[in-house]
Amino acid sequence: MNKTMKPANPMKVITGPDTRWSYANVWEPKSINGGTPKYSVSLIIPKSDTKTLAKIKTAIEAAYKEGEGKLKGNGKSVPALSAIKTPLRDGDTERPDDPAYAGCYFINANANSAPGIVDADRNPILTRSEVYSGVYGRASITFYAFNSSGNRGIACGLNNLQKVRDGEPLGGKASAEDDFATDEDDDFLD
């Protein structure tokens, strides 16, 4: 190992390229329920991406071990990992009416500072319309323990994003390109 390299952070994960981004608030921070404005994205991970899911579960366990003191708080013992909130959620049970989440897990990741956003060749993406809810890409995320206002658990921080490919926009709105893709004149007055 190169002596100048930092040891790998066991709580950091790079998701696979089939991760889909939803609720992508990555250009401007957004306040949720009156809270502090944050950059955020919901990462939709196919259940078939067992490699990414295994890395996430390992990172959640590492965050739990690293944060035992914080999770214990003023209590006498650390709550079991199975008894606290974790960010990996099942789309089939928590979002049964949303086809984008079918057969997937999802994680809501957020950050106080803007994530770096690059394309498949690692060039910065500066055009906001290139990144939208529905694109596919990799995400650099870090898991950490929290204990605030009586809520304890593991949360997910958003570091950086890499767009891999376009996808069907989520949210039901067709793009202008799709709306006007036909050469036909749909004027009903003809």
Predicted regions and their residues:
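Residues in well-ordered beta-strands of folded domains
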Residues: S42-I44, N108-N110, Q162-V164
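Structured, beta-strand-rich domain cores
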Residues: G69-G150
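OB-fold ssDNA-binding interfaces and closely related basic DNA-contact patches used
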Residues: M1-F106
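Compact mixed alphabeta submodule
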Residues: V118, N123-D190
